[in-house]
Amino acid sequence: MPKTAKKHHRKSNGPIEVSSAIHTGSSAKLKKKIRDIERALKKHEKLPADKKIEYERALKGLQVELQNSQKNLKEKENASKYHMVRFFERKKATRKLKQLRKQFDEMQNTAEPSKKELKKLRKQVKHGEIDLLYVCLFPKAEKYISLYPSQSAEDINDPNVKAGLRKTEAKRLQFRKEVEKLMDEGKLLFTVDDILAGKKVYHEFYKSSTTEKEIDAPAAKEEGENGEEQDDFFE
């Protein structure tokens, strides 16, 4: 009788190698390894307790690694896609803030400064600081929502587009509130002056109100700005 080829089966309780998938950071390899472990846990329900714990820990580790890998990929995509928008909006926010600070200082140094005008300017300066922080801190893993949209919901006739713009405006205001709260509570590890000095800053928003599916409002174009100017702040 002809010899039949022997089939090689992996032992049901054999170890599943995960380090190679984790160290590569490849989403495809991570997904495959996750499926392998999930299949093993489902197929072999009577695994030894220690082996089951080992597999479950490996699965959690791989899922976290996959999430990080996808987040890093999205950040790279958005960094390229929204680079120029953020670059021009940062310049605009910086210019406006410097003008407001100058006006405030001039008002303070007058012979008899108006308390009412000082209070008004102080509030405007704070809003200018929030605008600059908004541009710099907006999560790179999410679709960037322009701080200076060229159109408002009231200028649009299409009800679907109008609804999308209103929802986007709500997200924009919500993120500004998050930034203001961080600033008021002193939870930022840098100052607005650090940004104005050109220092690189970073803050991780673990939970943001923005979502990838929101309709973004178009950004207003800056006149007189040179698009070829280099900016390593967002790179």
Curated annotation (Swiss-Prot):
Recorded GO CC terms: nucleolus; preribosome, small subunit precursor
InterPro entries: Efg1 (IPR019310), EFG1_rRNA-proc (IPR050786)
Keyword Coiled coil: yes
Subcellular location: Nucleus, Nucleolus
Pfam family, one: Efg1
Sections of the chain in a coiled coil: 25-126, 162-185
Compositionally biased region (Acidic residues): 225-235
Keywords for the protein's UniProt record, in alphabetical order: Coiled coil, Nucleus, rRNA processing
Biased composition (Basic and acidic residues): 210-224
Region (Disordered): 1-31, 210-235
Biological processes per GO annotation: maturation of SSU-rRNA from tricistronic rRNA transcript (SSU-rRNA, 5.8S rRNA, LSU-rRNA)
Keyword set includes Kinase: no
Ranges of biased composition (kind: Basic residues): 1-12
UniProt family annotation: Belongs to the EFG1 family.
Function per UniProt: Involved in rRNA processing.
PANTHER family, per database record: RRNA-PROCESSING PROTEIN EFG1 (PTHR33911:SF1)
Name of this chain's protein: rRNA-processing protein EFG1
Species whose genome carries this gene: Lodderomyces elongisporus (strain ATCC 11503 / CBS 2605 / JCM 1781 / NBRC 1676 / NRRL YB-4239) (Yeast)
Gene behind the chain: EFG1
